[in-house]
Amino acid sequence: MDRRDFVRLSAIAGAMAVRGRPLAGQMVFPAASTVRRFDIPPFELEETTIADLQSAMASGRLTARSITQLYLDRIAELDRKGPTLRHVIEVNPDALAIADSLDQERKAGRVRGPLHGIPILLKDNIDTADRMTTTAGSLALAGSIPAHDAFIAARLRAAGAILLGKANLSEWAN
């Protein structure tokens, strides 16, 4: 039994106890054939910290491009194939080119700081003045490309972060 099943069954048992219904024989479990499981391979960077990534880039084991590609592949695996989570609305079409540029800066001895070459997702209500749209999760703003970066987006770019894409959220980010 995994954590989600435990929490679900605990909630059902609590609700039945409040209603005064007997628990024995009342539990109904979905048939095994109705539960869809996805075999999602583990992600090698899942528990990796920014400090770990910086160390790997400094030693030459990883590059900003290789890290960015790993994250793009993972987004495609979870959003477009497999469980189709749709947790990322769009990815930055320039992410790999930006990563290449930051790798060149690193080779030239210029590292902007601890975020240099680190891919980051932004919520879709943060303006980015690039080829990504900002919709705040609303169809009314579909195709909206801001004229200027939001303050946080500009600061992240200046620090060398790679704005990888926009994360999904509810309409108008409420």
How does the language model describe each region?
Residues 1-14:
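N-terminal secretory signal peptides and thylakoid transit peptides that target proteins
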Residues 16, 27-174:
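Gly/Ser-rich catalytic/binding loops embedded in alpha/beta enzyme cores
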Residues 19-22:
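C-terminal segment of classical bacterial N-terminal signal peptides
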